[in-house]
C-alpha cells in the first residue's frame, strides 16, 4: 500500500470518529497523521521494509505506527473496517459535502433516513431539509450548492495527492526498453489546483514494450484500453491515466494539444487559420499545400513560432490573454521558488505547530531564507492553543533568545490574529503595536451574508496595525467553499490601505486562486506567498504557491517577499 492510500484510510477513520462524536483530540491525531503521511517523500512501505521506527515521524505515535505497518503488510486496516461496520458508509460521503459536516449529516440520516447524495438532493428540493430543526431555508440552499460543487470537484485530486501517484509511475515507466522521452501533460502540467486524470506522452523506438509495462504496473486496478500506442488504466486510488506513444516529429504539437487548456488550444488554432495554417496534435500544416506536409511539430517552441508567438509556459495556458501577450514578444520570466527570500506565515509549538521556534528558524535558514516570521494563532482559536497577551509576551522573550543564536536570519515576531464576528481583532491594540507584522485571517462565521462578511473584513483591514490578509477566502479545496463576500471591493480597499494579500501555499487552500491573484496585481495590491507551515516539512509547500502565482502570470517583482529585507520592510509599512 502506497502513501496516498494510507493517508486516505486515516482520513476515513477521522471522519467516522467525528460522526461518532469521539474525543476531538483523538480525531485531531488522525488528521495530523494524514498531514504527516501526505508530506512524506519516501514511501512508508520502505520504512516498514527497512524496519525503520515509524514513531520517528512527527505526529506518528505507537498506535499510528502499528496501523501503518498493518496497512503496508496486509493492504487493509482492521480498525477502519470495524469502524465502518458501526457507521453507514453513506454517512461518510454525506459529511464530505460542503455545507453539511458530521453533525448535520448524522441528523439528516437519522431523521430523514437519507443515505445518499441523490436522496439528500431530493429532500432538499422538496423542502424536507428546511423543515428540520436547526436547518432552515438558507441551510437547504447551501446544501444544494454543496452537492453541485461536490459533483464537479469531489472526484478530483489535490496536486500533492496526484504527484504521489504519478511520480512513482514515471520512475517505473522510465525503465521501459526503447523509451526515449516521457512527460506529463494535461492539467497536471498546467499545475491546476485539482487533477481529474493524467495524460502521459512518450516517444519510444518500440512502443509495444512501453505499453505492456504500463499495463503491468503493480498499482493498476483496472485496464480500460489496451492498444499498441495508447492505453488507459485506473489506479487503486481511482486516478485514471492515459499513455500515448507519439512520433518524435509531432511530439511538441501533441504536448501542446494534450496539455491544453481547451480554451488555449482553440485560440491557438484560430490564430493559425488566420495565417493559412492548421495546427493539430500531429503538427503544423500549410492549408494551401496539397502535399499536407508537416512544417513544424517536433518541439513546442517550433509550433508557437509558426504563428509568431513566443513560447508560453504551461501554467499560463488557460485562454486568458496569454496568447495576446505572447504575440507582443517574449513573456516576462515568471516567479520561481528560488526568488523568495522569506516565509511570512508559519506556526510553532506555541499554538498548533509541531516544531519549536528554534527548529523552524534553523529550517528556514537551511533553505537560504534571509528573513522569516513566527505567526502563531490568537486566543479565540482555543483548539489550536492560541496565545493571549500573557503567553505572547513569553513568546517574544523566546524569540529574542533565538534571535541571539541565529544572526544569519532575521526573525520577525508576528501573530495570525483572528478576525472576530464583528470585524474587530482578537488581540489588544497595545499588543498589536508590539508585533513586527500583523497577519489577520477568517477562521469562523463563514456563513455570514456576503454584505456582512465584506463589512467584517473591511473593518479588520482598516485597523492601522494590519499588514497581511491571510488565505482571504478561507476556502479548503474540495471541502469548504470560499466565503461569500465582495472580493473585488476588498482587494481594491487593501490596495488603497497598503495591506498585502496572501497566496497561501498549502495545497488544500491555494488561496488566493489564480484569477483573484491576477486581479490583485491589476489593482496594485501587495502580494506575498507563504506556506502557513505547521511543521518543518511544510516549509517545502512553497512551490505550490509559486506554481499558483505562475498561473496568474506573476513575476518576482509582483511579490513582496522576493525583496531584500530592507526593501521588504519598507514595502510592508502602511
Where are the model-predicted features located?
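Charged, compositionally biased N-terminal leader segments and the immediate start
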Residues: 1-22
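Accessory alpha-helical DNA-binding modules that contact the DNA backbone or grooves
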Residues: 14, 24-231, 238, 243, ...
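Short amphipathic alpha-helical interaction patches enriched in hydrophobic/aromatic residues
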Residues: 14-21, 151-155, 442, 446, ...
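Short acidic-aromatic active-site loops that bind/stabilize oxyanions
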Residues: 159, 349-350
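Short loop/edge segments at beta-strand edges and connector loops
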Residues: 183-186, 413-415, 505
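Two-metal-ion RNase H-like nuclease active-site motif
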Residues: 184, 342-346, 416
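Charged catalytic cores and adjacent phosphate/nucleic-acid-binding surfaces used
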Residues: 191-277, 281, 285-348, 354-374, ...
Amino acid at each position: 500500500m502506497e502513501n496516498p492510500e494510507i493517508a486516505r484510510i486515516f482520513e476515513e477513520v477521522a471522519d467516522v470518529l467525528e460522526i461518532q462524536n469521539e474525543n476531538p483530540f483523538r480525531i485531531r491525531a488522525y488528521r495530523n497523521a494524514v498531514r504527516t503521511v501526505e508530506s512524506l517523500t519516501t514511501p512508508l512501505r520502505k520504512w516498514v521494509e527497512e524496519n525503520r521506527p515509524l514513531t520517528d515521524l512527527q505526529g506518528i505515535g505507537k498506535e499510528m505506527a502499528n496501523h501503518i505497518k498493518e496497512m503496508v503488510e496486509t493492504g487493509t486496516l482492521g480498525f477502519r473496517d470495524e469502524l465502518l461496520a458501526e457507521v453507514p458508509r453513506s454517512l461518510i460521503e454525506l459529511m464530505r459535502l460542503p455545507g453539511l459536516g458530521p453533525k448535520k449529516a448524522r441528523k439528516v440520516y437519522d431523521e430523514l433516513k437519507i443515505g445518499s447524495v441523490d436522496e439528500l438532493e431530493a429532500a432538499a428540493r422538496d423542502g424536507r431539509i428546511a423543515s428540520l430543526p436547526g436547518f432552515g431555508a438558507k441551510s437547504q440552499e447551501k446544501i444544494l450548492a454543496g452537492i453541485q460543487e461536490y459533483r464537479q470537484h469531489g472526484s478530483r485530486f489535490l496536486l500533492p495527492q496526484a504527484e504521489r501517484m504519478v511520480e512513482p509511475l514515471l520512475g517505473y515507466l522510465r525503465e521501459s526498453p526503447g523509451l526515449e522521452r516521457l512527460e506529463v501533460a494535461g492539467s497536471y502540467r498546467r499545475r491546476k489546483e485539482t487533477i481529474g486524470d493524467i495524460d502521459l506522452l512518450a516517444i519510444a523506438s518500440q512502443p509495444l514494450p512501453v505499453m505492456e509495462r504500463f499495463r503491468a504496473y503493480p498499482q493498476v486496478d483496472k485496464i480500460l484500453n489496451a492498444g499498441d500506442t495508447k492505453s488507459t488504466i485506473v489506479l487503486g486510488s481511482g486516478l485514471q491515466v492515459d499513455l500515448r506513444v507519439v512520433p518524435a516529429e509531432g511530439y511538441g504539437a501533441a504536448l501542446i494539444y494534450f496539455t491544453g487548456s481547451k480554451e488555449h488550444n482553440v485560440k491557438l488554432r484560430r490564430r493559425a487559420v488566420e495565417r493559412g495554417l492548421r495546427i493539430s496534435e500531429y503538427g503544423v500544416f500549410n492549408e494551401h499545400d496539397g502535399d499536407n506536409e508537416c512544417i513544424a511539430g517536433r518541439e513546442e517552441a517550433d509550433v508557437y513560432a509558426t504563428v509568431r508567438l513566443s513560447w508560453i509556459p504551461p501554467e499560463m495556458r488557460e485562454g486568458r490573454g496569454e496568447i495576446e501577450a505572447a504575440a507582443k514578444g517574449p513573456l516576462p520570466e515568471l516567479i520561481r521558488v528560488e526568488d523568495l527570500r522569506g516565509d511570512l506565515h508559519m506556526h510553532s509549538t506555541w499554538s498548533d505547530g509541531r516544531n519549536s521556534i528554534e527548529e523552524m528558524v534553523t529550517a528556514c535558514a537551511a533553505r537560504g531564507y534571509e528573513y522569516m516570521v513566527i505567526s502563531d494563532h490568537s486566543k479565540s482559536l482555543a483548539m489550536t492553543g492560541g496565545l493571549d497577551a500573557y503567553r505572547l509576551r513569553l513568546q517574544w522573550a523566546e524569540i529574542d533568545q533565538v534571535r541571539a543564536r541565529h544572526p544569519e536570519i532575521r526573525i520577525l515576531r508576528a501573530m495570525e490574529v483572528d478576525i472576530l464576528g464583528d470585524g474587530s481583532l482578537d488581540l489588544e491594540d497595545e499588543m498589536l503595536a508590539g508585533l513586527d507584522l500583523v497577519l489577520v485571517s477568517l477562521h469562523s462565521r463563514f456563513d455570514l451574508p456576503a454584505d456582512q462578511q465584506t463589512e467584517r473584513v473591511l473593518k479588520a483591514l482598516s485597523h492601522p496595525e494590519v499588514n497581511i490578509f491571510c488565505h482571504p477566502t478561507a476556502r479548503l479545496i474540495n471541502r469548504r467553499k470560499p466565503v461569500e463576500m465582495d472580493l473585488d471591493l476588498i482587494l481594491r480597499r487593501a490596495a488603497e490601505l497598503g495591506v498585502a494579500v496572501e497566496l497561501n501555499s498549502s495545497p488544500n487552500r491555494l488561496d488566493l486562486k489564480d484569477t483573484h491573484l491576477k486581479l490583485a496585481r491589476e489593482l496594485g495590491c501587495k502580494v506575498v506567498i507563504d506556506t502557513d507551515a505547521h511543521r518543518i516539512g511544510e516549509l517545502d509547500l512553497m512551490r505550490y504557491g509559486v506554481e499558483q502565482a505562475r498561473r496568474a502570470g506573476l513575476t518576482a517583482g509582483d511579490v513582496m517577499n522576493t525583496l531584500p529585507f530592507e526593501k521588504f520592510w519598507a514595502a510592508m509599512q502602511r
